[in-house]
């Protein structure tokens, strides 16, 4: 990952010391590297057990939604069991390790 070109974005909700929800995204900048940036999601993993559109990583396991040009194009499954508390860190490590391949395969295309 290169500063200004790609990043990992993590958001989570915690109550009583437990993770209620999270979203971890690998994002790529299609704007300026040192000016106005335009971040696009490349891959996303989330845990929203109380949402109609979400899912529970403890019941369903982690999966990655893979995007290209703002459209979901694939889903990667087959991850090991992980608790909601450990899943955000697991996703960050996975994205750090796999960023090059994921960005090359699913990142926004140059015009």
Language-model region placement:
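Negatively charged, low-complexity tracts enriched in Asp/Glu with abundant Ser/Thr
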Residues: 1-41
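Intrinsically disordered, low-complexity segments enriched in small/polar residues
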Residues: 2, 11, 15, 33, ...
């Amino acid at each position: 990952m290169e500063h200004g070109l790609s990043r990992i974005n993590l958001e989570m909700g915690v109550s009583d010391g437990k993770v209620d929800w999270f979203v971890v995204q690998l994002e790529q900048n299609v704007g300026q590297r040192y000016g106005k940036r335009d971040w696009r999601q490349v891959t996303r993993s989330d845990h929203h057990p109380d949402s109609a559109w979400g899912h529970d990583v403890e019941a369903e396991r982690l999966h990655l939604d893979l995007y290209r040009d703002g459209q979901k194009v694939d889903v990667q499954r087959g991850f090991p069991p992980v608790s909601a508390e450990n899943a955000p860190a697991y996703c960050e490590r996975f994205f750090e390790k796999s960023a090059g391949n994921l960005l090359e395969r699913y990142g926004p295309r140059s015009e």
